[in-house]
Swiss-Prot record:
GO cellular component: cytosol
CDD domains per UniProt: PEPCK_ATP
Listed name of the protein: Phosphoenolpyruvate carboxykinase (ATP)
Binding site for ATP: K201, H220, G236, L237, S238, G239, T240, G241, K242, T243, T244, E285, R322, T447
Binding site for Mn(2+): K201, H220, D257
Keyword Endoplasmic reticulum annotated: no
Key words, A-Z: ATP-binding, Cytoplasm, Decarboxylase, Gluconeogenesis, Lyase, Manganese, Metal-binding, Nucleotide-binding
Length: 536
């Protein structure tokens, strides 16, 4: 086996059973990874110098193919209602078969870190068979100083072999694709998918499992910090404006997707960003757009024209086109990835039913309720001829990545909010004046004005009313914002229609929360919306 690059010579990949590989490249820098990826036919150069790769049939994550090893250690720790178990026997066979699969192959290894807080960091070794995967994960995680690599000791390992096809009968999985997590021995096996995002989310899943035991809250959120050191956290599902609203020229970006909240404040899990590029433009998102023209950026499934210029409006391969780049490609990004305890938490929802106000103040109990609910609404696909909105509840704003029971995360968040006296706001970026198809999208100008007032602390000083359906506090008037949109019922042509829609949405919240009722305190149950009120 020929080994090249910089690494801890005492801990080569033979120590994790991969000694049959023909060549191993440790911690290659972007230029060398470009050379390998292009030479091997894995990727092509764009006109501006980014690296473009295609992921084949898997253009997104495969949540139905993700498993967690069920053993004595994890049996009582994992929320099995939401996570698929794999037996130790099946995991061990899969592991051994994947180790045998690397015989004679060239492998790429990156030694990286998940977590910008040294006390809670997860040193991670990622072994891939593709050079572009190696560059992708190098962009996304935190890169140690080169001098530190000689002493690097991984506490977590990912083996990513897209060319290995799993056998459901032999390996206890569902298809040829598998993501198998062993949290006892801290290893994840990824096979049968070329989608690079599986590696990123495997580290996130691991930290979501490990950190609550240390009383550190893992969060699927973006975060930024103001000039006075006032940090803010933005929870929200896809399409709610999490990335757009946290990108504020007046504030420093800490990170766009994954963070922890511990004893000393909040910290990014990552050292890069994985941004959607469909319909990306220089006008709407100039900072993200600029990264797509940088050497070192990885583009996924983006269509190129005849001059190799990306066409971000072309979703013919997938709507989930992406770019992966280091955080330092963003001009106002934090160099440390850390900030103090948040002053403000924003929970974003895109309510297509037109019921929610544009902003509401939450108590700690209401914040836990809405965090566990993880509500947004999606507009049904036109190909099905359906115009009714579809409610989506993804607990903790990231159910696929939460191995533990949601109440564990919710209770931890509630305690941190109360201890640090954090202001919590629910912000609706969805519809006003009626549901989707009748009303209009919430004006981004109004959302930004309300957000600015919330982050500055000014919004706390205005007069509030109690929402009749959800019980949270809604501002009566805010300077610079049209007062009419603050009361959603008044924006509807017919108040009775609004009441019926509100009753419908409240019923969905109540039905969704039934599974959590036995796991939360009575004061959190008291924070639920009230169906009887909505029915009046």
């Amino acid at each position: 086996m020929e080994e090249l690059g910089v690494n801890n010579s005492r801990l080569g990949i033979e120590t994790i059973g991969l000694g049959k590989a023909a060549n191993v490249h440790y911690n290659l820098l972007p230029a060398a990874l470009y050379e390998h990826a292009i030479r091997n036919g894995e990727a092509v150069l764009t006109a501006d110098g980014a690296l473009l790769a295609e992921t084949g049939q898997h253009t997104g994550r495969s949540p139905k193919d993700k498993f967690i090893l069920r053993d004595a250690n994890t049996d009582s720790q994992i929320w099995w209602d939401n996570n698929k178990p794999m037996s130790k026997e099946h995991f061990d066979i899969l592991h051994q078969d994947m180790l045998a699969h690397v015989a004679g192959k060239t492998l790429f290894v990156q030694d990286l870190i998940g977590g910008a807080d040294a006390a809670n960091a997860l040193p991670t070794r990622v072994v891939t068979e593709l050079a572009w995967h190696s560059l992708f994960i190098r962009n996304l995680l935190i890169r140690p100083e080169r001098a530190a690599l000689a002493d690097f000791e991984a506490k977590f390992t990912i083996i990513d072999l897209p060319s290995f096809k799993a056998d459901p009968a032999r390996h206890g999985c569902r298809t040829e694709t598998v993501i198998a997590c062993d949290f006892t021995n801290n290893i994840v096996l990824i096979a049968g998918t070329y989608y690079a995002g599986e590696m990123k989310k495997s580290v996130f899943t691991a930290l979501n499992y490990m950190l609550p035991a240390k009383q550190v809250m893992p969060m699927h959120c973006s975060a930024n910090v103001g000039p006075a050191g006032d940090s803010a956290v933005f929870f929200g599902l896809s399409g709610t404006g999490k990335t757009t609203l946290s990108a504020d020229p007046a504030r420093t970006l800490i990170g766009d997707d994954e963070h922890g909240w511990g004893e000393d404040g909040i910290f990014n899990f990552e050292g890069g960003c994985y941004a959607k590029t469909i319909r990306l433009s220089a006008e709407a998102e100039p900072e993200i757009y600029a990264t797509t023209k940088r050497f070192g950026t990885v583009l996924e499934n983006v269509v190129l024209d005849e001059n190799r210029v990306p066409d971000f409006n072309d979703g013919s391969k997938t709507e989930n086109t992406r770019c992966a780049y280091p955080l330092n490609f963003i001009p106002n990004a934090s160099p440390t990835g850390r900030a103090g305890h948040p002053k403000t938490i924003i929970m974003l929802t895109a309510d297509a039913f037109g019921v929610m106000p544009p902003i509401a103040k939450l108590t700690p109990e209401q914040a836990m309720y809405h965090f566990l609910s993880g509500y947004t609404a999606k507009v049904a696909g036109t190909e099905r001829g359906v115009t009714e909105p579809e409610a989506t509840f993804s607990t903790c704003f990231g159910a696929p990545f939460m191995p533990r029971h949601p109440a564990e995360y919710g209770n931890l968040l509630k305690e941190l909010i109360a201890r640090h006296e954090v202001d919590c706001w629910l912000v609706n970026t969805g519809w006003t004046g009626g549901a989707y198809g009748v009303g209009n999208r919430m004006p981004i100008k109004a959302t930004r004005a309300l957000l600015t007032a919330a982050l500055s602390g000014e919004l706390k000083k205005v007069e509030f009313r109690t929402d009749a359906n959800f019980g949270f506090a809604v501002p009566v008037s805010v300077e610079g914002v049209d007062t009419s949109i603050l009361d959603p019922r008044s924006t509807w042509a017919n108040g009775t229609d609004y009441d019926a829609q509100a009753k419908k949405l409240v019923g969905m919240f109540i039905a969704n929360f039934e599974k959590f009722e036995a796991h939360v305190d009575s004061n959190v149950l008291d924070a639920a919306p009230v169906l009887a009120v909505a029915a009046q």
